[in-house]
């Protein structure tokens, strides 16, 4: 395996499927467990790297890069959660043994991607050992409405003001301030696309049994603890909800990126 970059114990690889779907990876077929990490809206595989230093060397890490983002910025952008999940599932089936222990993890949009991928993997015969869903409810129903409100916590067509507020809340506004107008427009358009993708996804109830661990901030108004508890209905396996101090990006209270 050729590595051009090493950060947080993870190599940037240029080798078959790892280089395309998982550009930043700590992949080793001999490791007992691999953690597949999905980015939140506006983020890329690079955003997931700090997690690798937390889980330790014993666990393999595969950081997902969606088409049109990060190292795959020259590709046409993927538009649906289902399409991302299908690509990741195909890649994992090709590189993983069916006996491998694989855990899906993601925050907000990443949680939607993690659940959908885990569900598609189960159908493909590579059922995950567990799923960690952070900062996202399966749906939310507004008062007085008979229709599920498509989760995502943003307007149907988020404008630039909303997007800049989002960047400030995620601690990314300073980085975007240093960009030129063309680069800033690219960042905002990509973020808008990701938020709409998240909002448009409503998970299906499927006969899956993988363990599910949900985390959310006690002050999160997008994915409230009560709304996240509804994930209990989406697996016949073990379920646990953990609430932590903070809002939607509660993990920043703990020094995590």
Where are each of the predicted segments found?
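Domain-scale detector for complete catalytic domains at protein termini or as standalone homologs
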Residues: 2-105, 112-257
